[in-house]
């Protein structure tokens, strides 16, 4: 059931058919979220007044034919799975000259981890219900010939704030149709959840069970099973690290739960338990196997900390990159000009592709797209000069004291010596990061809990490797970026 390009489809369209105008049928409301490609809005159907979610994807972000095919495949897969009770149901698709719109069921109950944290208590028995749902989605995907490839907590939402809300899988942007026995080779997913065979670039549907096993480990302990200060360190742990069942809270967790995790996080895909077999495991089937006593509150606090990505750090890196001296930047300015052939001040996908070809690179189009995604901090579809420098400069230049002072001052607009929530709001607006939970962002960095960030807290954040990457593909995380592609030596000493 492989998706094939439709030969009759015009080259600048995603859908192989014409559609009515979205606004003739729906009223667009508030923004619900921002993804790598699209923005999701609340929308209301005019004829019924029913609320839905509308994911709007700007076509300017679809820079190559492969991107158009990816969106069309995502739509097909959503239709393919739409009868499953724990998959967000697609309502319809619309396309005009500027956007592709996917209208789907709206989920107003929040993300998986956020819901657990806000409840304030959690038990193994509750974890059973959640992982049973997740494994049920995986089993359904595999039985219908679909590999999800990006299972992570952010892709599971509750359909309502009620206690009996259903957990639903969303975002099939990396999902693919596959045939039994077929292997895939492109490295995609999210660092903590990726299976070892993905890193080895030869894998099948078993990767989804691994990712579900990682989610289960985090649900019960509040931390990922394979962790390191850097993303390359995380990958080393995934390939070689031992599962920790000795430190808290594992001594208090049932043996049955640990046995299931062992079987889901088996490194050999051939020996790994299938989704169906996992659903038949005693911990899931036998109600008495999973205790109902609350887990240690420390698990919840760790879970909250883990689920917040550090967005301030990304903004700060770009601020630093833009203030470095000509000498520190070296030949990067000339390289940027060489790639930016129309002198627009931004690099498009086509310019990046042409620039790489000129320096003799033999990267595939999908790999060049990966570099683009990794460098494009504000998801604009192009790389500006600041983003280019942030992607190509070595970190030890970024972390020098005077650069950290300058970045701190950028946020600390009134020079008070602290970054406040209002100043953070202002910076997020400038960077186009709307609807970001600022309270959580500050709490993550605010070590003395005074509600603001001082310079020492800011410096500690900048020098800590958080490894929380969410790139569409992970070439950047596999120690490969634009600097490598152009042969730039970003690691020269700063002497």
UniProtKB/Swiss-Prot annotation:
Residues 26-284 form the Protein kinase domain. The active site is at 150 (proton acceptor). Activated by calcium. Autophosphorylation may play an important role in the regulation of the kinase activity. Pfam families: EF-hand_7 (PF13499), Pkinase (PF00069). Residues 290-320 are annotated as: Autoinhibitory domain. It catalyses: L-seryl-[protein] + ATP = O-phospho-L-seryl-[protein] + ADP + H(+); L-threonyl-[protein] + ATP = O-phospho-L-threonyl-[protein] + ADP + H(+). One of its GO terms (biological process) is positive regulation of abscisic acid-activated signaling pathway. Residues 327-362, 363-398, 399-434, 438-468 form the EF-hand domain. One of its GO terms (molecular function) is calcium ion binding. Induction: By drought and high-slat stress, but not by low-temperature, heat stress or abscisic acid treatment. Disruption phenotype: Mutant cpk11-2 shows reduced ABA and salt responsiveness in seed germination. Interacts with Di19. There are 3 contiguous domains conserved in the CDPK subfamily: a kinase domain, an autoinhibitory (junction) domain and a calmodulin-like domain. The autoinhibitory domain (290-320) inactivates kinase activity under calcium-free conditions. This is Calcium-dependent protein kinase 11. It comes from Arabidopsis thaliana (Mouse-ear cress). The gene is CPK11.
